[in-house]
Amino acid sequence: MTDHRLLLDTHVALWLDSGDERLRPSTRASIDGCWKSDGTIFLSAVTAWEIALLVDTGRIDLDIPVDAWIRRFLERPGIEAVSLGHEAAARSYQLHHLEHRDPTDRLLIATAIELGCPLVTYDERIARFGARHGRQYKFAVAA
């Protein structure tokens, strides 16, 4: 899927930054296609928070402090920070009543809905949510 605007899930942002092989060629092509079309790749404040939490709990290691990593990532051409809006925060609570209960993922789903762009993720629960409710919520998953 090639779109002119994409929101990255946390693991995708980390894999993109590190050149991780888990980032499939088709996903890389979608991201590259977005860049080549002068599109925008969004990094959510929720993702920045989750990365900080993962570092703090020892689940991941970065080569530089979290705030420096985020600044470096956002300095790439075509990458834009997106704040958590009030509408997305409220919508994420509404998603609580569905089968997807992870609050971080619900916030990212709601942000993608608010932005009107696909969420690039390999999270199977998010993909299932997209398959079941994508039309209703105008939500798409790209991976």
Feature-to-residue mapping (PLM):
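General small-molecule cofactor/ligand-binding pocket signal
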Residues: 42, 82, 138-140
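Active-site neighborhoods of divalent-metal-dependent phosphate/nucleic-acid chemistry enzymes
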Residues: 63, 76-124
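A generic structural signal for short hydrophobic patches within well-formed alpha-helices
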Residues: 13, 48, 89, 126-127
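Short, well-structured N-terminal submotif of metal-dependent ribonuclease cores
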Residues: 1-43, 57-72, 142-143
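Acidic, PIN/NYN-like endoribonuclease modules and their adjacent C-terminal/linker elements
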Residues: 1, 109-143
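A secondary-structure boundary/capping signal
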Residues: 9-10, 47, 122
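Residues that scaffold the ATP/ADP-binding catalytic core of kinase and kinase-like folds
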Residues: 15-17, 54, 91-95, 129-130
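Phosphate/NTP-binding elements of NTP-utilizing enzymes
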Residues: 51
